[in-house]
Amino acid sequence: VQAKRDPDFMIIARTDARGVEGLEAAVQRAVAYAEAGADALFPEALESAEEFRTFAHEIQKRGVTVPLIANMTEFGKTPLLSVAEFERLGYRGVLFPVTALRTALQAIDRLLAELKLFGSQRDWLHHMMTRQELYDLLRYKDSHERWEGRTYEHSNE
């Protein structure tokens, strides 16, 4: 924390104590992290909305004012709560670390199975971005204009 030089760099202190030592241990560690200078606190593996509420209340009661961050990882012990629900519980940010990846990989798996079975992607077109949507997302035109006319020649000498 003391070595932090960039004001835009945020140190989010994570505690996994809840799963092993209980909620009170997680609160104690989080308070220590805040006192050491953490910019935000991230309690991992809380098991109910009530635990999230209690954690936030206990942190605040002990004078800690840094933002709280929640983690929404599917198929774990944490219930699937919405961003609005977390906000009502006292959390200022929510991480969805593998939601998009899991969704994309399942779609890829299904597409490949259908390609193997039917040999065509025709029935998947409505699931796909158009070429223009992809270019817009990647800001292709900006990159093309920036690099147009520039070439790189590699020499084996």
Language-model features and meaning:
Residues 115-157:
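Flexible C-terminal active-site loop/helix
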Residues 1-96, 102, 106-113, 144, ...:
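Alpha/beta enzyme core
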